[in-house]
Amino acid sequence: MTTFTVIIPARFASSRLPGKPLADIAGKPMIRHVWEKARRSGASRVVVATDNEQVKNAVLQFGGEVCMTSEKHNSGTERLAEVVEKLDIADDEIIVNIQGDEPLIPPVIVQQVAANLAKYRVNMASLAVKIEDVQELFNPNAVKVLTDQAGYVLYFSRAAIPWNRDEFADIAANTKNLDDLRLGDHYLRHIGIYAYRAGFIKRYVQWQPTALEKIESLEQLRVLWYGERIHVELAEEVPAVGVDTPEDLEKVRSILTAF
């Protein structure tokens, strides 16, 4: 079994849902649900990275490990790099990044993404699921990923990729309904879970932001821009909704209180 460390970035400030990591779900703060899922994945170590004392105290109260980080990071990856440096994690250690707003993340895919990284000997790996809903394909909030035949990423985009010239042209011209489209297996939605080598995280944050990542607002495009490879597999289990809005929070509460 692959050995790996999970780091969970947990920001208290959120424009749409302030205090999100501490939101109560079935009698526990959300961050505890995420931490418990990470523990069940078989990770050798689980660390919550936060810039907030309230989150820190909550994690310590339920027995978790915390690393306090700067409030000035521009991205979650910068926060990971600070944790790697502070905890003196070896460069070859596999780090899995789970967002602190994913209380329903299946433990099996946490282990899967770590194994994916180890198997393909790349510096970064991730997961995807097939897109079966046509509306999702054209939703810019659903990030699409295009790979080669071996699963190495060609591009990430908020647009519908690959663009079906004949089918999609009719939609653009309003001569065909979205519901009449039939999607092939090559349309994939990216899942925001990553595995990296610790040394690669330190190298990544030294790179300057790129034009493509700014246009798409997708940080992972920086990796492709600088010539590194990312491997993506189909997730063994499709993760449920994360928590971005008060409405998402209510959905997750209803799911977890049902058990």
From Swiss-Prot:
The name this protein goes by in its record: 3-deoxy-manno-octulosonate cytidylyltransferase
Catalytic activity: 3-deoxy-alpha-D-manno-oct-2-ulosonate + CTP = CMP-3-deoxy-beta-D-manno-octulosonate + diphosphate
Gene3D superfamilies xref list: Spore Coat Polysaccharide Biosynthesis Protein SpsA, Chain A (3.90.550.10)
Function recorded in the entry: Activates KDO (a required 8-carbon sugar) for incorporation into bacterial lipopolysaccharide in Gram-negative bacteria.
Localization annotation: Cytoplasm
Molecular function terms, GO-annotated: 3-deoxy-manno-octulosonate cytidylyltransferase activity
EC number: 2.7.7.38
Keywords attached to this entry: Cytoplasm, Lipopolysaccharide biosynthesis, Nucleotidyltransferase, Transferase
Family per similarity comment: Belongs to the KdsB family.
GO BP term, pick one: lipopolysaccharide biosynthetic process
Functional pathway: Nucleotide-sugar biosynthesis; CMP-3-deoxy-D-manno-octulosonate biosynthesis; CMP-3-deoxy-D-manno-octulosonate from 3-deoxy-D-manno-octulosonate and CTP: step 1/1; Bacterial outer membrane biogenesis; lipopolysaccharide biosynthesis
Principal localisation: cytoplasm
Family matches, as CDD domains: CMP-KDO-Synthetase
NCBIfam families: kdsB, PRK05450.1-3, PRK05450.1-5, PRK13368.1
Any one annotated GO CC term: cytosol
Alphabetized HAMAP family for the sequence: KdsB
Domain of life: Bacteria
